[in-house]
Amino acid sequence: MRITIASPRCYAAVGKKENQEDSLFPLKGNATADTRVFMVCDGMGGHENGEVASACVAETMGRLTAQQPLGTSSEMQNAFEKALQETYQQLDLLDKSDSIRKMGTTLTFLALCTDGVLVAHIGDSRVYQVRPEQGVVFQTRDHSLVNDLVAIGELTEEQAKTYPHRNIITRAIQPHQELPAKATFKVLTDVRKGDLFFLCSDGVIEKLEDDLCQILTEKLPLEKRLENLEQEALQRDTRDNNSAYLIEVTEVSGASMEAEIQSDSTTQQDETNPKAVDTDKKSRPNWLRWFFLLLTILALALAAFFMMKEKG
């Protein structure tokens, strides 16, 4: 499979924060139609700490994965995991004070491969695959407290949107972790001409989630669509940093029969589409449901201090 793309577009806005803690790879203005690796990182930790963490992760992960020759998604995943180990080491070297120790970042990653598109993420930054005639056909599932509570049936999708602790994430890239957070991977093989891949920090979703698909699929040049998205975020008084990459597929050649079969099924969505999460409490024994709830709360209480992202 050979995936051809238009020249990618990106933006990074500060929102209502004092400084920019999001980082992109490639840096704005450096991506071309030949670029095969993209990332958005959303730093946390306050002051300059989040900025340091996200910049370190974007630069290290980007540099090491972008030098990987064009190959399969399996080969790229191996390169990603090796790069992530090196990235943790780099963050450890930056950790020289108690305040810096609180820093961390999310990561969302996309690579164009010979057998499809490899997606990886840690935290609540997202990747969307949008098909103009169908809407969102894939999106990553946030590593967050609310999603864990939805998964065990304690919250519905609607309740999760207004839950007081919805900003707590359960995975992040941080220095000196005894058990370093691992990425969730997905290989997308149903890729078609006209598909859009959208990587973004959670600041984009803050006020625009319901209108995201409409804005991205407007019959306008790619750059204009992204400009409209940035302006909408500004007009709606988005508080958080908001940054994104938008990639449009212009041609797909040599697609496998597997991709054609998957295009007529829901297999691609089931694993990560939030709507596919089982929220039927009656389908789970009470003891098992409460066991997982208590386990989740205990684990997240220990991590919450490091994981709470500032939204002001």
Q: Locations of the language-model features?
A:
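PP2C/PPM-type serine/threonine phosphatase catalytic domain
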Residues: 1-312
